[in-house]
Every structure is written in structure tokens, then in C-alpha cells.
């Protein structure tokens, strides 16, 4: 599988904050940083985002496993093979159930516990539940993280069929 096996987006609006998540300043010059990427099928998205950071921080990827289907985690890793190799982060892959924003949140909390002095750049370019967990984490921990998003313009007719509906309560 290549990074472009799944063309789910026709273009990208560029790296800019999500509404309500703009930050005037990132980490201080002496504060170490991590790039935490929730990976999906579009293997070029995480690399496009990290290439905007100077210098590129250490990468910790998160893969949705178990996935929505049994083969999806393997497809995700295959589609991100170049990114994982370029940033030498295969051994740092973390897992969070693809359909669970709470596991995504906990994965970020675990990374923060492992790297308590690091600023987290979070790229939610994987599943929507992972994006929800990342946003929830950013709301609760705004002083040491920020969301980086590339605003994809979706391909028409990119998916078909129906699946299980997931309902979450964040109260």
C-alpha cells in the first residue's frame, strides 16, 4: 500500500487552527515538544503537517486498533509506512480503539505522563472518534498542547454503505 492508496480528499485548506482553538504562542524555545499523530488511511497528511514545524519534534503515532474492520490497522500502518520510516517512530506506535474517543484521550494522557515536560502538537488526521478525543484532551489541557489540522476538502463519493452508529457522552 502506498501513502496515496486512499484519496479521500481532493485538496487541503492548509494548516490553521480549528475554530476556537487558535493559540497565540506555542511552546517556549527551551521546551521540548512531541508531534502526536492519530493516523488514518491518507498517509501524506501527518507528514504534510509535521513539515510545517521547525525543527520537527519527536513523533509518537497513534493507530486505531482494534479498527472498525479487522484489517484497518494494518492498512493504516501500510499507508503511513513512509512517514513512520522517515521519522523513525515505528517502535513508538501507540494504540487506541478506532471507534473510541475516550481511548484516544487516554492515549494522550499516557503520553503526557511519559513525557511530562513536553509540549504536544496533536494532529487528529485519523478517525473521527480519535479527533473527538483529541479535541476533548486539548480543551482540558490547553496549556501544554495544541491541535494542528490541515482542513481537507473531501472527495465526493468517498465512502458508501452503513455501519454501526456510535453515541458518546462527554458530560
What are these regions (language model features)?
Residues 1, 37-47, 66-68, 121-132, ...:
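Gly/Ser/Thr-rich loops at beta-strand to alpha-helix junctions
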Residues 2-6, 142-171:
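Short, flexible loop segments at boundaries between secondary-structure elements
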Residues 33-34, 58, 119-121:
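Structural motif
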Residues 50-55, 110-115, 135-144:
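Short, surface-exposed basic-aromatic patches at helix termini and helix-loop junctions that form
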Residues 38-111:
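Redox- and metal-dependent alpha/beta enzyme cores, enriched for Fe-S-associated oxidoreductases
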Residues 100-118, 130-136:
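A short, acidic, amphipathic alpha-helical segment used as a generic capping/interface helix at domain edges
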Residues 1-19, 66-68, 75-84, 154:
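Long, charge-dense
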Residues 4-30, 41-47:
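Active-site glycine-rich loop that binds ribose-phosphate moieties when present
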